[in-house]
Regions:
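Extended catalytic core of nucleotide-activated donor transferases of GT-like folds
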Residues: 11-98
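Donor nucleotide-sugar binding/catalytic pocket of nucleotide-sugar-dependent glycosyltransferases
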Residues: 86-144
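Conserved catalytic-core segment of nucleotide-activated headgroup transferases in glycan assembly
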Residues: 130-243
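Acidic donor-binding loop of glycosyltransferase active sites
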Residues: 246-264, 274-277
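Short hydrophobic beta-strand element within catalytic cores of glycosyltransferases
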Residues: 278-281, 297-298
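A charged, aromatic-enriched C-terminal amphipathic alpha-helix characteristic of glycosyltransferases
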Residues: 321-329, 339-370
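C-terminal alpha-helical cap of glycosyltransferases
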Residues: 340, 361-403
């Protein structure tokens, strides 16, 4: 394939993901278009943006999206998907949300129903694979991480990784506030409690953002100020993929945890399972594709209405639902993992083995090829015509000159 890449903005995310010394990143960088111009119409366009921005510019157009983290995508997103020839979702949950929803089409003047808006184009699912060369069991810990973890006195820590987004207590998408409260409640007033590490941030890694994270932690902590509470540590700042893996594997990290309300896929949880340590989480939305119920410390959950504060107005819907864990059971499971850790270790190793086989970059590449190749096979290709060579002209007869008579 002759691949060209057009970089697109994603909110306030800085364009600093590519590392100059990384050979894979170098291959990406040299394919980025410096000017948004192409010499001809491309055969295939893979558009990886939010669906209302999908644009068909090629002979075959494929939209790729994680969808939205609740059950009702916006109508404009469904319209965007219908502009494409195929739509690829990152999980069965996100695909199902698009397939099930229908909207009434209203006349702008009369407001009468003119028809139904629904997803009409073909769909497929392509998971977000993890790099098995990076995410794996390791004992290697960088000096930077070693210094950070040296400040943690506990030898048993639960680790959460994810953004702390908007919303009141219990309403942020990752449900970090309630996870904190459950942790404090379950292990308060104990002599040797475990710790909780939050690798989190809001919009970035600034000092202002770090202070905002501390303010949120203290808001929950202060509501329980009469108790002796276990320690919660904030790990704030940018880590490389290798450092993220080292963090997952640090000997003080004994288990991964998430109360997430909704995921389009949940790749940080997938990458964390590659460390071979227990994962405590609901098997509910996007992560249900790779969290095996036999190997996960599964938190019971139910589908509940999404609070209005959790999403921007354009993405919210009063009928939308997401997952909410049973907080009482979640606390008991955390306590059991802490008190009976050995019984969970073998299952965690099995989950690691299964996920490394099924959800690697290589497996993702094979699945993408299975999806894309049939589409490309039907694209008309220019054919070079080979005309037959012409025979040489016969030699002209030289007639004798007539003598003048």
């Amino acid at each position: 394939y002759d691949v060209r890449i057009q970089s697109v903005r994603w909110g306030s995310t800085p364009p600093n993901a590519l590392e100059k010394d990384n050979p894979i990143h170098q291959e990406i960088d040299k394919r980025i278009l410096r000017q948004p111009n192409l010499e001809k119409q491309p055969d295939l366009h893979l558009h990886i943006v939010i669906p209302n921005e999908f644009q068909p510019i090629a002979k075959v157009n494929v939209g790729m999206t994680a969808g939205i983290e609740h059950t009702i995508p916006p109508a404009s997103w469904v319209e965007g998907c219908n502009r494409m020839d195929l739509n690829i979702f990152t999980s069965e949950f996100s695909r199902t949300s698009f397939q099930k929803i229908q909207f009434d089409k209203l006349d702008n003047k009369t407001k009468k129903v003119q028809g139904i808006l629904k997803l009409e184009k073909p769909t497929d699912v392509l998971f977000e694979g993890a790099d098995t060369n990076v995410y794996k069991e390791t004992k290697e810990i960088s000096e930077k991480l070693s210094q950070k973890f040296s400040k943690i006195k506990e030898d048993f820590c639960f680790l959460f990784v994810g953004h702390w987004l908007t919303g009141n207590l219990g309403e942020d998408r990752k449900d970090i506030g309630m996870m904190l409260k459950v942790f404090y409640t379950m292990f308060k007033n104990q002599k040797n409690p475990p710790a909780l590490i939050l690798k989190t941030s809001g919009a970035g890694f600034s000092i202002i953002d770090r202070n905002e994270m501390m303010k949120k932690i203290n808001l929950v902590k202060d509501s329980m100020k009469d108790d002796k509470l276990p320690n919660v540590y904030l790990l704030h700042g940018d880590l490389s993929d290798e450092e993220m893996n080292q963090m997952y594997n640090h000997p003080k990290v004994k288990a991964h945890i998430s109360f997430t309300h909704g995921e389009g896929f949940g790749r940080p949880m997938l990458e964390a399972t590659f460390s071979g340590k227990p994962m405590i989480a609901p098997i509910s939305t996007g992560q249900a594709d790779f969290l095996n119920k036999e190997y996960t410390v599964q938190i019971p959950h139910q589908m509940t209405k999404v609070p209005a504060s959790a999403f921007p107005k354009d993405y919210a819907n009063p009928e939308a639902e997401w997952s909410t864990v049973n907080y009482g059971m979640a606390g008991k499971l955390m306590e059991d993992v802490y008190n009976n850790y050995d019984k969970y270790k073998l299952k965690a190793k099995k989950q690691m083995i299964v996920n490394r086989e099924l959800f690697s970059h290589e497996s993702m590449k094979q699945k993408l090829d299975e999806i894309i190749s049939p589409l490309l096979a039907n694209i008309p290709q220019p054919v070079e015509l080979k005309l037959p060579s012409l025979k040489k002209e016969p030699k002209k007869l030289k007639l004798p000159k007539l003598k003048k008579g």
